[in-house]
Amino acid sequence: MMTYIVFILSIIFVISFVGFSSKPSPIYGGLVLIISGAVGCGIVLSFGGSFLGLMVFLIYLGGMLVVFGYTTAMATEQYPEVWVSNKAVLGAFVMGLLSELLLACYILKDDEVDAVFEFNGMGDWVIYDTGDSGFFSEEAMGIAALYSYGTWLVIVTGWSLFIGVLVIMEVTRGN
């Protein structure tokens, strides 16, 4: 049963990002990003990462909701464009779904998942194994590993969020 739930959440996750990338009105784009963020947190929760799912939910949906609230307030339209109101937007949505489907079929044919995921460099993370001691939480050890071995990942994430805010401010500034 859990496999089916994760499978359905994954399908909703991909469809929501295709729906966002087909460029509807900013109101619906923000709504789709909120839905995809909540579904992504549900996927993380289904794999047992309750702390990480909660942090993503609070940071992403809290911070980005404010940004999209301001952008939709600045870009309000009398008749917002939905996916079926314009043939170009609907075509982009359908083409995005078809390309995702073809990519999934290409990756999954003949069990070629090894070409996408390889776990060769996992030896460094074994240091943070909590074992059966019961004193340390696995999530706390994961956060410690993220900040020690994944310093570059934290820096790139912070920089990309900063650039994202600058781009949103530039787009909504107007003429």
From Swiss-Prot:
Query: Which InterPro entries does this entry report, sorted A to Z?
Result: ComplexI_Subunit6, NADH_UbQ/plastoQ_OxRdtase_su6, Nuo/plastoQ_OxRdtase_6_NuoJ
Annotated localization = Mitochondrion inner membrane
One GO MF term attached to the UniProt entry: NADH dehydrogenase (ubiquinone) activity
- Any one of the GO BP annotations: mitochondrial respiratory chain complex I assembly
Keyword vocabulary terms for this entry: Electron transport, Membrane, Mitochondrion, Mitochondrion inner membrane, NAD, Respiratory chain, Translocase, Transmembrane, Transmembrane helix, Transport, Ubiquinone
Name the membrane topology term: Multi-pass membrane protein
Major place of residence: mitochondrion
Cellular component terms, GO, for this chain's entry? mitochondrial inner membrane
State one Pfam family annotation: Oxidored_q3
What domain of life? Eukaryota
**Subunit structure comment from the entry:** Core subunit of respiratory chain NADH dehydrogenase (Complex I) which is composed of 45 different subunits.
Q: Per the similarity annotation, which family is this? A: Belongs to the complex I subunit 6 family.
**Cited function:** Core subunit of the mitochondrial membrane respiratory chain NADH dehydrogenase (Complex I) which catalyzes electron transfer from NADH through the respiratory chain, using ubiquinone as an electron acceptor. Essential for the catalytic activity and assembly of complex I.
Protein name per the record: NADH-ubiquinone oxidoreductase chain 6
Identify the species of origin.
Halichoerus grypus (Gray seal)
